[in-house]
Amino acid sequence: MTIVELSFQKTVYQLQIMIIVIVTDLYNSTNNGTTVSARRLVEALEERGHEVRLICSGTEGKNRYILPTYQHGLIPKVASWNGMVFCKPIDSIIAKALEGADIVHCYMPFPLEKRVMQMAKEKGIPCTTAMHVQAQHVTYNAGMSGCNLLSSWVYVWIRQYYYQYFDYIHCPSQFMADELERYHYKAKKYVISNGICPIFKPKEVSKIPSLKGKFCILMVGRLSKEKRQDVLIKACSLSKYASNIQLILAGHGPKEEKYHKLSQSLPNPVIFGFYSQSDLVNLYNMCDLYVHAADVESEAISCMEAFACGLVPVIANSPISATKQFALDERSLFKHGDAQDLADHIDYWIEHPEEKKELSKKYIESSAKYDFDHCVDMMIGMFNDAIADKANV
């Protein structure tokens, strides 16, 4: 690890330049919140001068150590339906990535990450990890969303299989840190938001001709069972103003075909699509209301981006979702899974545009605490803690 001195306004700062190994099975996708956060972190670390090496699947590139993925069997097949892959750990490739590394950060509790951690420890390289996967992601996609016993078992199992070997866990929300405490995860927990990139801010964007005169409601996220876009579709049909509502669902996923069929009863066809980051900025600034209906969420980058652009959110008050932490008052919360209650909230905001305008300003102000650069600094702080603790052993 080298030390670089930076001089700003006659003040000298020391920047520790690190070789950081990031481990994540999936990196190329932009339809997955965890992958998006990983990509943004890598870019930010490189901009700060760090050398970042990626152990992942996907296409070759600078400082990328590409591994094949499991293709056969039930688990890889089910994972692929949900946009996930599992890498095959190949020791020779992993060893090359670890040469001279200062720190390893693993994203998921999967076989690849576990093997990298084992090899890093053998070489004396400190490791940190993250908790982006909730047990309910497993139970929902297994068709057992109401089985709390199974959810508890999953948390205990991944603790024994993976997390017990780490001393530092990044939690994207206090909710996730509390969940780990509840299931007796002993590692030090760093509550660090994934952060809001500076590109997401208010700007004047006129509605395209086909949307003019309509009340546009947006939800961004994978079209999967736990995201509950079905509740939003039903709520739009129950609204007093259904004929004036244009629903936009941004994302892909296993429930896409089902939601196309479900939305056929709406007066205005739902707009389904996948959008680039720059297009999302325009979309957030063009729409009238943001809804986050998910039952399961460790943070929700899209909701943060929406209110940073001034789009007032209406969020499901699910007990297993962290997103409700962003609600500034009860007008931004609805009963999770309750389409009628969501419809009532939608109607309220259609009928109270001046209140929405005032609340929009407050949401923009509240977004400052999730400044992306500050969040990256906190991640670097966690890495430095792990390195310092290892040096003191």
Q: Predicted segments — roles?
A:
Residues 58, 175, 195:
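Carbohydrate-associated surface elements
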Residues 318, 328-339, 348-353:
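Conserved acidic donor-binding segment of nucleotide-sugar-dependent glycosyltransferases
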Residues 109, 295:
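Aromatic "clamp/platform" in nucleotide-sugar-dependent glycosyltransferases that forms part
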